[in-house]
Amino acid sequence: MTAKYPDKDSIAKLLSDENIPNQIMEHEPLLTIPPAIEYFTKNPPSVEAPFIYCKNLFLKNKAGGFYLITAAHDTKIDYKVLCKLFKTKNGNIREAEKEKLSLYLHVEPGHVNSFSLLNLSDEQKKEVQFHLDKTLLEKYKTIGIPPMNSSSTCWIKPDDLKKLLEKNGFTVNVTDLNEIKGDDKKEDKKEDKKEKKDKKEKKEKKDDKKKEKKDNKKNDNLDEDISSLGIQNKKEENFSDWYSECITKSEMIDYYDISGCYILRPWSYEIWEKIQEYLDKKIKKIGVRNYNFPLFVSQKALFKEKEHVEGFSPEVAWVTKSGKGEIDPPIAIRPTSETIMYPAFAKWIRSHRDLPLLANQWTNIVRWEFKNPTPFIRTREFLWQEGHTVHATFEEAEKMVYTILEFYRSVYEDLCACPVIKGIKTENEKFPGGYCTTSIEGLLPNGKGVQAATSHHLGQNFSKMFDISFLDKEKNKQLAWQTSWGLTTRTIGVLVMMHGDNKGLVLPPKVAPIQVVIVPIKTSKDNAEEILGKGNEIYEQLKKEDIRVTFDDSDLHTPGWKYAEWELKGVPIRIEYGKKDLSKEQVTFFCRDNLEKFPVKLTEVVDKVKEMLDTIQKRMFQKQVDRVKNSTTHAKDFDSFLEGLNKGHIVYTPWCKESFCEDNVKDKVKEIASKSEEQDTVGTCKTLNMPLDQPKLEEGTKCFFCGKPAKIFAVWGRSY
């Protein structure tokens, strides 16, 4: 069954509806207590003190039943104590299996929380007891609990949490988890005596093995713990948390205290600069020039085009105050710039000689999304380029639309090695107020489609509203034809999701901030000068060829640590070498995309780097092409369509092209999901686009859903 409260936004809405004060902070996933304590020590919440972060356990009793415990993070949870408190045999209390977490609470391991009780069915409520640590109510004003996912924390008064759960039909057992009677302590001491002796013997054996292993190391530093660098979540098991780990541990982003807003660090911003440079050259070649327009838009201008503003209205952020004074009327922060640019276009254009007007700006945009934010993919503030052009004819505008769409395809496929589908949006999915919308769509490894970029033919709708007109060669007044098009930092999220693996990022060479890292292996001071000298020599050779290279000769970490760090950051090629390699006049190449190693002669390093950068780029693209091909279903009927969606595929279907049919498909999928008890049943879907590269539509083909004559093939999928 679908969770009633699947994410932090649903919890935030519930707390708002109940008028319960709270603060929700976003951060990297805090799957265990130590990183959580470290994080909140550095980034304390703005809440009433004293406050404390909580640990949450979901336990099962072998004799029957489950317990969810919320306690102060420093409360010691002894399962023997719990057995006595819950009046069951020693050894009966243990952690619930992953499957039970999913079935009862709708969470993954590492994300157990008190709010997840709200997802229990009436029958499940009879099986689960909730115990709230007495310490929380007696000592703390505010407690921190993950709101369904440990990538954010909700700070709330413990009494408010208690009342909320009681209002929703739960008995809240306020329990002293440290409570043990004297007789029990004596019994425990007897029981524990042998156990402690056994543990001591095991520890001594373990320590002996560790010492033996350490003594065998040639380098005292080689036992350096590199586990903290690794990605804890598996891409194929927990995609969302894997993604969060990738982009934070690789230093692409940092979280900010306003939900949906993120700090882009150099490792991601430099990728954006590569994309910007690539696309900027292309649009300038066809005559587009860069502008910079204001961030703010007046209420009057924004509401001038009714259909347009209705499409963005829920996402518009308004400035309503200046100091203590009210701003009347309020000023909007641009969700897009049509209504800012077009009054200026109307002033600048008088004659056919002023056309075409081809404008672009690289800027930031604010859209106050209410959906669950995902860095780079769905955020409240993001970087983008937005192009706006004005033409004398429909055909000129149409040519511009498809020229830009091809540029966008090239950004994704040729630069980022991410395959996309070029196509036209349906009437339901097109840009509000436009004539038609074209798009490029991608398929992510989690089975979701993603709108990668859009190019819109606006027709004359906006030129009518803003009186963008010109005198033609015969001195007749004509309304102009317009286009708008945009590409965002979503590109970064897409390439991370497509190419990344369980070691971290895998960056396409063309956008990687660093394409090659050189890591020397020094075993003694005797050969350090020779080793470092050769590394510097290779570094200078590659730098002369405009290859983005770094030489990691730091003594702070071992080679093993450096390997893990640069693999996490996704650098395409690592060159590693030591004294033995140099004696053979060679180095070792490591390719990040397929994890292969091979020797390369010193005299061939530069040529081999160039060759491998090109090979890796092509290999990464082909790997994704093959993945998408294997994740595509062609369906002629609704059952096959649904089967494809539930596999995480995109689905090509013959379709009647009717908007009401599209709506009916969405409603039917949602209805089926609401009645299904299968965890993997898809609850939502949409048309991604109608591909420009159409399969052959045989005469007499029917719409896969309504049975009317099919007019076109559409691509459907789940989507961000």
Where are the regions a protein language model picked out?
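NTP/phosphate- and nucleic-acid-binding module
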Residues: 1-720
